[in-house]
Amino acid sequence: MTDYKATLNLPDTAFPMKAGLPQREPQTLQRWDSIGLYQKLREIGKDRPKFVLHDGPPYANGNIHIGHAVNKILKDMILRSKTLAGFDAPYVPGWDCHGLPIEHKVEVTHGKNLSADRTRELCRAYASEQIEGQKSEFIRLGVLGDWSNPYLTMNFANEAGEIRALAEMVKGGFVFKGLKPVNWCFDCGSALAEAEVEYQDKKSSTIDVAFPIADEAKLAAAFGVPSLGKPASIVIWTTTPWTIPANQALNVHPEFEYALVDVGDKLLVLAAELVESCLARYKLEGTVIATTTGQALELINFRHPFYDRLSPVYLADYVELGAGTGIVHCSPAYGVDDFTICKQYGLSNDDIISPVQSNGVYVESLEFFGGQFIFKANQNIIDKLVEVGSLMDTETISHSYMHCWRHKSPLIYRATAQWFVGMDKQPESGETLRKRAVKAIEDTEFVPAWGQARLHSMIANRPDWCISRQRNWGVPIPFFLHKESGDLHPRTVELMEEVAQRVEKEGIEAWFKLDASELLGDEAGKYDKISDTLDVWFDSGTTHWHVLRGSHPMGHESGPRADLYLEGSDQHRGWFHSSLLTGCMLDDHAPYRELLTHGFVVDENGRKMSKSLNNVVAPQKVNDSLGADIMRLWVSATDYSGEMAVSDQILQRSADAYRRIRNTARFLLSNLTGFNPATDILPAEEMLALDRWAVDRTLLLQRELLEHYGEYRFWNVYSKIHNFCVQELGGFYLDIIKDRQYTTAANSTARRSCQTALFHISEALVRWIAPILAFTADELWQFLPGERNESVMLNTWYDGLTEMPADFDMDRAYWERIMAVKTSVNKEMENLRAAKAIGGNLQAEVTLYAEESLVADLSKLSNELRFVLITSTASVAPLASAPADAVVTEVAGLKLKVLKSSHAKCARCWHHREDVGVNPEHPEICGRCVDNISGAGEVRHYA
């Protein structure tokens, strides 16, 4: 038997079937580094329009987790796609370096007795070490960036830039010193930003407390009774017994109805609507003897239960009837609403009673409870109320309560002297910050769109921004306050610039070691040099001003503006929020044109990642087991607008999809062997109809993909590329062209036409996958035929695809119909193979019985219809002639009948043909194969 293998154009490529990503990807990273890929991208991008994505800096602490990986991969996919779209899209990664978590780590390692200078020194060293670890992990994900020159908030230039930004805000009239209740953590010993507060369930003691009347005549008059006749008290309800020592007022709603209730030995004032529930709680019976409005009770004095001072009634709209008594006890030092109401009634900062120290312990001078930790004092306060006869009831409830995000410990509101940015404070010029921010939100694009309403509601309802902290490791607030008046030095802005210049050379240490006399001279004795530091959200929130400024030629004329900020959905109250406020203060607009938000990563059951649940997916392990490209493919395939589910099983599905894409690419490459694009490529008009359709279909898909890339809809990109590989290519085109590729003459038009199409498809495909499968695209690029530069990323989207003419006979709709027919034939073949009626498709002879228009379509392919259907013979007949046993298909007007061929099998092409053995020199092959080996070669027109 003759071996005809040498006469075939068998597929051949060195592109490996097995990806070996965990081993191959690090080698690719080394290659990118050795060729200076990022620098080359900047060189070729000099004259391109710029696209700037400003990196939200991750915190320099610990290894990266799956959420970090998602964030960095999304950014990289966007910037790679923008580069391929013809933009100069640099990526400067950043790190957030100051703040409590790092200071806490240093304290845990080295103890709490460090000097402030030593603490800062160790914090800087720790942050540097953490950055190097995270940097290598980000690079391993295939993220292209200026990793040699990242921006760090602890860089001296950035620390100085932050001080200059603050100086601009002081100059603009946005900053003020105030005594206000702020979120306070005893473990941190500092105020917390809104973004550092989380809510957990907490058990608390509730108490109903009676405050005895001081102005008996006024209370009687308010209720319209001649006299009280017996002791009377107003009753409050609270979940924070520890605030009772700081009580300074009692709040009622001006429009609610309040009742004077006789319970036998005394009178109680309660909200009329709550009398029944309150008396049941107190196990008392009583009679309502009079009612009045809250308005009538204003400024009536009651007595504190155990201190010799008065508690007047103030009106407050925030009082509710959902629980309690309808009267709220008011401690202005420990509640935002309480503070606001007391200020409205004329209490000065000096009037406000604030007995709780920064560590949560009452001052020693507080009568009865001095030196006690507030939460431990709750029971002692309850006991005192029992002793004085003021406790009406106590219960234990579980409720949602604010906790420190770092220590998980309960927080309190605590009035302290802090520095604030005023949301509604009138600046030196222009609108208030709140109005500016609301307008800026309206001018910003949001992906997904719901982010706009979320950020808007946060800005509309947020309090003034407390920007000061009482920590060591942070950018200083370099203010000098007059010792007597407490006012800022009149040359504050000028002095801040002098400090910034020193910080630029020596870092924040320059301020802390500064002697006031160096800047103030003889005035130094009159001023206090403050030691507060800036909120870390101010650090990252001002990076647009001192990192991004000047880097974007398309920026707003009044300041820098990034094209895109991209972070997790928690950053609506974090970086998006602080950046918006600083941008509106400094430049009167948001520092971004568009905000993109991605969801949190959860497991396949929607649960958060947790060591206790054993469901943590670590990116480092994925890199080592499957490869970063598999993780990148999972990110692209997942709709990031909601929660993003991941697990080993989900990643395995991504690996399966990856193999299908890789195998498609390998098939394309293996059939381009011997193809030189410089000499072998055919113009579109010389290509076979099916090949022209394949290139046209690729062009249509590319248009869709570019639109999806432009809208950051990567899951659409992934699904369409995957479907193209599996369906149009793997399930149709590539299956059909195998016979032509392998059996026709190597340099025949039939084969070169097909190779031309495969080349165009490959050139497009390698670019399509480059933003997602960064490593695989780079590998594929090295194996494509023809001269080419060092990386797919040094190119733009492929422009060599051609569209079929509008009047082309075998147009898009034609091939859609042919595909449907082929699908029906394939289904019947599968049934026959399962029944063992035939061994394979090429054993089949198929007759298609079709209605008139379909007969015309099928007949256009003439004797090449069998190559499209991949059968040994294929014939077409009118539908009316279909025998009774013809199979009805899903295609309207089509039946078919398949018979097993009785003809011999060609040893070369494996078709069963009548003319096998006709040529005595080649008794084992068909006439077509004889012609392809020793004759002029077969001529194909369509497929």
Swiss-Prot record:
The gene is ileS. Its EC number is 6.1.1.5. It comes from Pseudomonas syringae pv. syringae (strain B728a). Belongs to the class-I aminoacyl-tRNA synthetase family. IleS type 1 subfamily. This is Isoleucine--tRNA ligase. One of its GO terms (molecular function) is tRNA binding. Its main location: cytoplasm. The keyword Chloroplast does not apply. One of its GO terms (biological process) is isoleucyl-tRNA aminoacylation. Catalyzes the attachment of isoleucine to tRNA(Ile). As IleRS can inadvertently accommodate and process structurally similar amino acids such as valine, to avoid such errors it has two additional distinct tRNA(Ile)-dependent editing activities. One activity is designated as 'pretransfer' editing and involves the hydrolysis of activated Val-AMP. The other activity is designated 'posttransfer' editing and involves deacylation of mischarged Val-tRNA(Ile).
